[in-house]
């Protein structure tokens, strides 16, 4: 499971998800990837589950990059606890994802294999996604 080794602040505020991703919104390493279409929190368990789904499908062929990291702690209070008496303890970590963010990248496999692997991974994630390739960004005249 992904989580920071150490953090400056143990508990953080929830915040708001506004606008589109301005960083990490194009393919930097691989030839194919999945890009978020909606905003949301992706937990470290969901990232790990998607990673396993991709790796099981590509079976040792190709290389996978995880482009998001869960660096935000989410606190929870125990069940059946009255309100008050401070903020709960950190229970799990999430990555804040905005529309346009590339979540996973893949290279070294045929496009059909990559497309199916990314489809399997997208079912494990709480945000809507789309399959993207290097060719898509070259046609748009994107940042490269």
From Swiss-Prot:
Keyword annotations: Ribonucleoprotein, Ribosomal protein, RNA-binding, rRNA-binding, tRNA-binding
GO cellular-component term (any): cytosolic large ribosomal subunit
One protein family per Pfam: Ribosomal_L16
Coiled-coil parts of chain: none
SUPFAM superfamilies the record matches: Ribosomal protein L16p/L10e
Role summary: Binds 23S rRNA and is also seen to make contacts with the A and possibly P site tRNAs.
Protein name (record): Large ribosomal subunit protein uL16
């Amino acid at each position: 499971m992904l989580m920071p080794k150490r953090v400056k602040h143990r508990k953080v505020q929830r915040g708001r998800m506004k606008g589109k991703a301005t960083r990490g919104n194009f393919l930097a390493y691989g030839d194919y990837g999945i890009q978020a279409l909606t905003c949301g929190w992706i937990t470290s368990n969901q990232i790990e589950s998607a990673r396993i789904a991709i790796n099981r499908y590509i079976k040792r062929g190709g290389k996978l990059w995880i482009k998001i990291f869960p660096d935000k702690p989410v606190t929870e209070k125990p069940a059946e606890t009255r309100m008050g008496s401070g903020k709960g303890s950190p229970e799990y970590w999430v990555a804040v994802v905005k529309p346009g963010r590339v979540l996973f990248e893949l290279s070294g496999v045929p496009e059909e294999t990559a497309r199916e692997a990314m489809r399997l991974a997208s079912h494990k994630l709480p945000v809507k996604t789309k399959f993207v390739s290097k060719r898509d960004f070259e046609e748009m005249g994107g940042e490269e």
